[in-house]
Amino acid sequence: MIAKIIKGTNFSGVVSYMLSKREGQIKVLQANGVRSSLPNDIAHDFNLQASMHPSVQKPVCHTILSFSAHDLERLTDATMVKITNEYLHEMGYGDTQNLIVRHSDRQHPHLHICINRIGNNGKTISDHNEKYRSTKICRELTKRYGLTIGEGKQEVNRSRLRGEDKLRYEIFYTIKAVLPQSQTWKDFVTVFITIEQPKLIRNIRV
């Protein structure tokens, strides 16, 4: 289980994206403090609460929780909601509006959460060290629910990568292949440069 956190200013844009997939590819799992019907109504509900603290420039917290494809059969809607609510509670978002939508347009189970950083009490919810805290919480929840522990970059669908991201993962896989065969650091560097130098030259833009 991994989380990607994106801050923003526009609830309407996030909600529209979350609900814009084709029929059968999305499912609203939870609407806490907001309506669950039309995107404009949902965004209005979020904005109304955010207006309680207008000085906050980025009240939108769009979080994507992704799981290993190996856990697909185990991750029922109810289980994903339970895990997500535990994640939200431990991140400090237990007392604010949220919308949870499951997407099925990828091979791996994942869901999107739109969170209001302005709590139900009108106060801003702290995002201090949120990436560190999120990583730790995801690790704990993965163990707690006996989920598959992903192997970082190896869990990525490489066919979807472009540009710098594609090059970065090619380098990662080259290192993975070359390292076990290298007896010394010099051996590793020599083989690595031989393989990667042409790729780097092709991707450099002057």
Q: Which residues does each predicted region cover?
A:
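N-terminal nicking endonuclease/strand-transfer module with a His-rich metal-binding environment
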Residues: M1-V206
